[in-house]
């Protein structure tokens, strides 16, 4: 269930883009190209515009300046090729919905509204459950799953739309260390299967072990197509001390405000 053909054009191409809300500019002069098979991690402080960037890519927020193409099209048209896992997904623990039914929601779309699910839909759902290693939980109520398992269900739901690009906003924000590692391993597998991934994360100590390249976004984007989290990137993006792990030992990356004391 991997994409059948590679795109001649980038999946996402952003040039000199600025965007925001009312009179507040949140993103400024953003340039980013997402190529097929990329696995890009975006780090940065809260309020730095990471979620806003996702809204622009999904066509939910128009840019105030610059251009963006998704699959060579306007985001409103190209987003049908995108699977999205939001930062927070509300669910009613008293509602007896099964895991399989949650994943099946990913098959909804303009072509499926008011139509019964097909045998093809059911097959895709089962494949997605297998991809996130939850086949045995298909008939279980969602409320019985752990936080990490629920997050894998939401990833499966996004995969059910058979996307070429997967956007994930803080996929490990509410899970423990073990579940975090499992989710990143899962995303690594999905990327190897041909799905391009762009994710937001605060797990600086984990993210560089799995993604192919890293960028730091704090209103402006510091991205050079490299995997290493550099001191310059942290200083430019955070403007504060950040603890990283190097060779198994914690060390502090000093940012500008300490240097200027």
Question: Which functions belong to the PLM regions below?
Answer:
Residues 43-45:
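The feature captures the beta-strand-to-loop junction immediately N-terminal to the Walker
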Residues 58:
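Helix-to-loop junction immediately C-terminal to a conserved catalytic motif
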Residues 66-78:
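Conserved ABC transporter NBD signature motif
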Residues 104, 119-137:
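Conserved ABC ATPase "signature" region
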Residues 141-145, 149:
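Conserved ABC ATPase signature
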Residues 166-170:
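Catalytic Walker B motif of ABC-type/P-loop ATPase nucleotide-binding domains
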Residues 231-261:
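ABC ATPase nucleotide-binding domains
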């Amino acid at each position: 269930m991997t994409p059948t053909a590679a795109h001649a054009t980038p999946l996402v191409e952003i040039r000199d883009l600025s965007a925001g809300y009312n009179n507040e500019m949140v993103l400024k002069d953003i340039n980013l190209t997402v190529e097929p098979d990329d696995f890009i991690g975006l780090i940065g402080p809260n309020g730095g515009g990471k979620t806003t960037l996702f809204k622009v890519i999904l066509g939910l927020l128009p840019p105030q300046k610059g251009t963006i193409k998704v699959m060579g099209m306007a985001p409103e048209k190209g987003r049908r090729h995108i699977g999205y896992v939001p930062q927070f997904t509300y669910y009613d623990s008293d509602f007896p919905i099964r895991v399989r039914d949650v994943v099946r929601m990913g098959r909804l779309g303009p072509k499926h509204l008011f139509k019964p699910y097909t045998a093809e839909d059911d097959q895709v759902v089962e494949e997605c459950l297998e991809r996130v290693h939850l086949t045995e939980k298909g008939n279980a109520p969602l409320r019985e799953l752990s936080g990490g398992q629920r997050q894998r269900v939401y990833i499966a739901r996004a995969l059910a739309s058979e996307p070429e690009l997967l956007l994930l906003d803080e996929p490990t924000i509410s899970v423990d260390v073990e579940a975090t590692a499992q989710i990143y391993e899962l995303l690594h597998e999905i990327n190897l299967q041909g799905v391009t991934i762009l994710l937001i994360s605060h797990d600086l100590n984990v993210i560089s072990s799995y993604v192919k390249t890293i960028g730091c976004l704090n209103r402006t984007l510091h991205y050079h197509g490299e995997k290493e989290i550099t001191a310059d990137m942290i200083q430019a993006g955070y403007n504060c001390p950040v603890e990283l792990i190097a060779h198994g030992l914690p060390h502090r990356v000093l940012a500008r405000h300490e240097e200027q004391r």
